[in-house]
UniProtKB/Swiss-Prot annotation:
Its main location: plastid. Keywords: Chloroplast, Membrane, Plastid, Transmembrane, Transmembrane helix. Disulfide bonds: none annotated. The keyword rRNA processing does not apply. It is found in: Plastid, Chloroplast membrane. The keyword Transmembrane applies. Pfam families: TIC20. Belongs to the Tic20 family. The chain crosses the membrane at residues 5-25, 87-107, 133-153, 159-179. It is a multi-pass membrane protein. One of its GO terms (cellular component) is chloroplast membrane. This is Tic20 family protein Ycf60.
């Protein structure tokens, strides 16, 4: 029981921190949205572009957890060094706090996807949040499927080739989506972006 107490405290503090951060983000968003109230809702502002980039951290960390950790050690030393100094600490934190992904998922869904969202509707942010959630779910499904394969296959040449292909699929789709968000344009990923469009149209 004494050993479980620190873990419980850490979980409670983590949950409280996430709720506090989401509240602060909501207040900032409301304040900024208020300053843009005279703009057309379909105008893509700098806030929309920056806000559309943030949700893609969720599928990126999920993809690095599922595929990156297995194949990146085989990449050139310089690539691994850059990874260790930039993304690896975030991936370690993400892996050691598995409930974090679920909490962030529901926060994004509650704030941006629901019809009765408590914040003003921004179509560009909503599209990218929904797309990032879909990419996260696809990454989770692909990762679970890959881990379910026999370890002999996963460690074989064909298994590593499959893992490498899935890793680059994750990296390319997220990079493309982020670039389009910076440009203020809607991403057009085959099937995925179409599914997001259909979901948004059905909610209108």
């Amino acid at each position: 029981m004494p050993n479980k107490l620190p873990s419980l405290i850490i979980i409670m503090l983590t949950t409280f921190s996430i709720i506090l951060i989401s509240f602060i983000i909501r207040q900032l968003y409301l304040h900024i949205a208020q300053s843009y109230k005279n703009h057309d809702v379909n105008d893509i502002t700098i806030v929309d572009r920056l806000g559309s980039i943030l949700p893609y951290w969720l599928p990126l960390l999920e993809g690095l957890q599922n595929f990156g950790q297995q194949i990146l050690p085989d990449y050139p030393f310089n690539v691994m060094q850059i990874y260790k100094k930039t993304l690896m600490p975030l991936v370690i934190f993400y892996v050691t706090h598995p409930t974090l992904a679920v909490i962030i998922f529901f926060i994004l869904y509650y704030l941006f996807v629901r019809n009765k969202s408590p914040i003003p509707d921004r179509p560009f942010i909503r599209f990218n949040v929904l797309q990032s959630i879909l990419l996260f779910l696809i990454n989770s499904l692909l990762g679970a499927t890959f881990r379910a394969l026999p370890i002999e296959f996963r460690m074989s040449l064909y298994g590593l080739m499959m893992c490498n292909t899935l890793f680059w699929f994750v990296l390319s789709t997220i990079s493309y989506s982020i670039i389009k968000s910076i440009e203020g344009k809607y991403a057009k990923i085959p099937v995925i972006s179409q599914a997001v469009r259909i979901q948004i149209d059905n909610q209108l």
